Amino acid sequence: SGWDRQRIVDALIRETEVDVVTAQEISREVEELISSSNISMATSPLIRELVDAKLIERGLEQARKRHTRLGMPLYDVDQLILHPNKENANVPHGPEATNLTLAERIKKEYALLSIFSEEVADAHMRGDIHLHDLGFIDRPYCSGQSLEYIKRFGLSLPNSIAMAKPAKHAEVLLAHMVKFAAALQSHFAGAIGWDAVNLFFAPYLVGMRDEEVKQLAQMMIFEFSQQAVARGGQAIFTDLNLYWEIPRHFEDVPAIGPMGEYTGKTYSHYEHEAQRFAWFLFEVYREGDGSGRPFFFPKPLVHITEKFFRTRGHREFLHHICEVASQKGNTYFVFDRGETAKISECCRLSFKLDASDLEDAQQPWKMRYCALQNVTLNLPRIGYLSGGDNRSLFERVEEFMDMGVRAHLEKKAFIEKLLSYGENGPLALLAMKRDGSSYLRMHRASYLIGMVGLNELVQIQTGKQMSESQEAFKFGLKVIAHMKLLTDRLSESHGMHFVLEQTPAESTAYRFAKLDLEYHWQKAHHVVKGDIPRGEVYYTNSTYLNNGAVMNPIERVRLEGLFHPLIEAGSLTHIWLGEAKPSKESLANFVIKTFKQTQNDQIAFSPEFTTCNRCHRTSRGLTEICGYCGSRDVDGITRITGYFTRISSWNKGKIGELHDRYRNQGFLRVAGKEEKYEGKMVMLISA
């Protein structure tokens, strides 16, 4: 529409609030520069860059920031479209995935320039802390909810072109659940967790034959597994919380059945139907998909409680889910000891229920929880900066945590602003009030403070890793206990629920290690794990012991479990099985021992598989050649953090960790009632 210098003036005044005289001077200088350069076509991006240069010349850095154009270089976009993004192994490669990544890149820049303060943004950029899911700055992290919400209110979503009344049949309830999960996935950055799924389906299963219940179980698992058409081509990161018994807090709760109506009974009357559904879900998991591969999603989390062991059929069910754990690795064992009750999701996150939550259990549709954001601290960085001085170390822990809290306050303010627009705003789904209060209950939100590299921090301070000496291990406990004390103090002072979390750190452990090798090479190269020449570097995740430490698996579970009472937002210990396929009896004994003799919150047994892209068959263990057809066109499958995925999608840091993992080959074999460990034990700590 022709050149008009006034547009530059208007944009500068509107966006940067510089005075009119300065804006006019800059517009004239840019016009002269374009005229003298013989540029045939002055595009908007070019003009904006020239204006930014003039702002920098005048020392107007804040104005330059506000005037910045967000985007990506042409070369980066070209690479992005041609090559897969390995930052998240759950994102496939395709047009929808590149759309997601492009949008994420812009929102990341927006978050760091506009939402977070310069101090917080700088702390993230230099690697003191990590702000997770910056590309999803306009949504909370993850959520836990109840099927009772859609059973009671149907599928009535803001901006939807059709409204569905409460389901009459189990298949329709499942369809509502999947659709609602997809809608929630587009409003949360992380996992979508569902509480007591088998129990809340139970009133719909009365009178159904076993074949019909199994078909429903099959539909559920395949529907969630094949939803790789949702956000960015991703499968919905779904967690199903399952119980063999009726949880105490749901025993006397009136049951909601077809059409959203009360059945006249409490949930304690539906134990048999709930157990049938749980049993058949694990039958489907045991069979695997059409190629015999384990299902990546939805993830089944079985709660093991005191009541579990008093419930009829628990031994058979425990053997059943342990057989699935051995053959396919799907089962997560969540330990709710004493009076504890929680909803678990997202690799290891859990929402522990307090007295007010248990009151909400009388109306389970109110039981909706979210973690608003996850901020992770680079613990080895604290070690490098402290120079071996313990007092300095604990002071820096406090400084880093204060920066994390500041990031949470800034994200909270932004989300509250978006929610203030209600059902006409960008977070309409989370602002909807079907039961009189917003779907996202901000007063119940948690704010996560995670950690990476405790093992390396301890190594820097004591000269030993946590698996190498009792003194080193106890120092690690002291650091986390100090962080727990700080989160409690910060929660009280800010009136917010700050909690420690074991960050999954799929890419963060790699990012921190790379940055520290760049900025603190002299110290970092002694403690960073992996293969430095190949760039396959990482820090030990959260509070874990070294992945490669050779030790009895029950001792690893016991020692790592000593941290778990301090980490309110959830913890997990992996037992890497490799090719081993232990008996269901030995795994069941292991689970019982973990429940009764340790403080561990959650465990998962993780086997490894090779899947062939030619003959589509799957075999145990990681191999370079298909054992069936001899093809080299194969891919490995195992857990990257808290979920299964193809190894070809992993980043370099996770590849380095995979090489180092100590597999418990031979694991445990039952001899009478005793377990015999066949591996080599390096050390046992009495802690």
Q: Where in the sequence are the language-model features?
A:
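Catalytic-loop motifs flanking and including active-site residues across diverse enzymes
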Residues: 4, 8, 193, 447-454, ...
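Conserved catalytic cores of very large enzyme subunits
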Residues: 81-443, 464-465, 469-627, 631
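Charged, amphipathic alpha-helical regulatory modules used
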Residues: 1-85, 89, 659-663
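Intrinsic, low-complexity terminal and presequence regions
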Residues: 610-629, 642-687
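Contiguous, well-ordered alpha-helical segments that form the cores/surfaces of helical PPI scaffolds
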Residues: 199, 242, 447-460, 481, ...
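Metallocofactor- and cofactor-centric catalytic cores in central/energy metabolism, strongly enriched
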Residues: 214, 221, 460, 654, ...
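Short Cys/His-rich micro-motifs in 6-15 aa windows
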Residues: 630-636, 640
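Core of folded catalytic or high-affinity ligand/protein-binding domains
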Residues: 439, 443-450, 654-655
